């Protein structure tokens, strides 16, 4: 049940945030703002997501997942509810940028990693990588679900009302999460699986459950840089994908479906990563995933000269299957090396690489 909960929360976390790609064109059409101005919204969203990581992780360590998940959904609902009244760039910078970025972190993998690691210690440790991979797959499922839903809402009632509806869904989600049986969810029933300071002591001598000590290890910075560099590359492309496909000649519906299909494929790519890494080694799988990402980006670039559906499919498939596939490997490694009471703060600090890389990548996408 813990993995299902974390999957659903990731579905809301990433899926709601990626709806920006669908809102971009109608907001641009009504407001007349430049693409760079609009890209700044998503850049702030990613920046807030990254900078909030260490704070959210600290909160998870101190007050637990229930409060963080509930508060995050409430903040997300507030951001979208206020965004429907936006008339100036700073309104969106604050709401769907800063507030939504913090909320996305609160209900995303930082909280999920701490919660899942509590349940997959000791005799269950071998199941940690698959559990994290399934949880990560919620991100792709969220894109697959919320992109077409948002497009239908915008086509039916307009982008402002669409933000309002999504805000209500998020508020309702906060109530549901608060009412869940957290006494059973927060701690494993087997005392041998408790996350005391002993939890991470046995398997990795290089690890530490203290953030200050973790920052002095090469493992922390290696994982941080994997997340950072990957995010720069991915977010050079992702926020502008729908607008780009429309600009080269595809219809808005086709572009949205392509982006949704891209999210659909990430579900399988991410879910399979943990198993493949266990069978063939993390290094081989990560290398293969980067090769697929590069192939997908090159394929998207060729659409400027040859905007045909076959080439679009050939670009979306490798890009979708590889996007996010590095995340489960990083999370599982961090959970093993830094298991303990300080895992939330450590993993939150590590995921600052995603936010900062995403912010830089998004800003560059608007400039270019």
Annotate each PLM feature.
Residues 335-368:
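A late C-terminal transmembrane helix in Major Facilitator Superfamily
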Residues 96-137, 333, 339:
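Cytoplasmic helix-loop-helix junction between adjacent transmembrane helices
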Residues 66-69, 92, 286:
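Primarily marks hydrophobic transmembrane alpha-helices of the MFS/SLC 12-helix fold
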Residues 11, 79, 91-107, 228, ...:
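Hydrophobic core of transmembrane alpha-helices in multi-pass small-molecule transporters
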Residues 18-25, 147, 212-275, 361:
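Extracytoplasmic gate region of multi-pass secondary transporters
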Residues 52-65, 269-282:
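Helix-to-loop junctions at the C-terminal end of transmembrane segments
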Residues 74-87, 292-305:
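C-terminal ends and interior cores of transmembrane alpha-helices
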Residues 134-186:
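Helix-loop-helix hairpin linking two adjacent transmembrane segments in secondary transporters
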């Amino acid at each position: 049940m813990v993995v299902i909960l974390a999957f659903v929360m990731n579905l809301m976390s990433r899926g709601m945030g990626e709806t920006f790609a669908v809102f971009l064109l109608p907001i641009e059409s009504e407001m007349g703002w430049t693409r760079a101005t609009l890209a700044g919204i998503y850049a702030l969203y990613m920046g807030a997501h990254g900078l909030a990581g260490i704070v959210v992780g600290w909160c998870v360590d101190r007050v637990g997942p229930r409060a963080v998940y509930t508060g995050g959904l409430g903040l997300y609902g507030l951001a979208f509810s206020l965004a429907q009244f936006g008339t100036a760039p700073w309104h969106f910078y604050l709401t769907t940028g800063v507030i939504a970025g913090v909320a996305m972190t609160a209900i995303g993998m930082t909280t999920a990693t701490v919660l899942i690691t509590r349940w997959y210690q000791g005799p269950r440790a071998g199941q940690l990588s698959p559990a994290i991979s399934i949880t990560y797959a919620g991100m792709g499922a969220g894109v697959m679900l919320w992109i077409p839903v948002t497009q239908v809402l915008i086509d039916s009632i307009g982008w402002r009302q669409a933000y309002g509806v999504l805000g209500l869904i998020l508020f309702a989600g906060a109530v549901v999460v608060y009412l869940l049986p957290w006494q059973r969810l927060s701690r494993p029933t087997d005392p041998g699986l408790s996350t005391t300071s002993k939890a991470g002591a046995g398997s990795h001598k290089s690890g530490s459950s203290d953030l200050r000590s973790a920052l002095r290890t090469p493992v922390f910075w290696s994982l941080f840089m994997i997340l950072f560099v990957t995010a720069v590359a991915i977010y050079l492309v992702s926020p502008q994908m729908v607008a780009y496909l429309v600009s080269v000649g595809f219809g808005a519906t086709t572009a949205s479906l392509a982006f949704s299909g891209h999210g659909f494929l990430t579900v399988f790519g991410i879910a399979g990563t943990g198993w493949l890494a266990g069978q063939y080694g993390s290094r081989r799988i990560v290398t293969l995933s980067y090769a697929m990402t590069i192939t997908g980006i090159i394929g998207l670039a060729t659409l400027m000269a040859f905007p045909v559906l076959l080439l679009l499919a050939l670009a979306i498939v490798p890009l979708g299957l590889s996007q996010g596939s590095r995340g489960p490997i990083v999370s599982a490694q961090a959970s093993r090396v830094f298991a303990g009471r300080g895992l939330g703060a450590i993993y939150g600090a590590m995921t600052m690489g995603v936010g900062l890389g995403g912010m830089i990548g998004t800003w560059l996408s608007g400039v270019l």
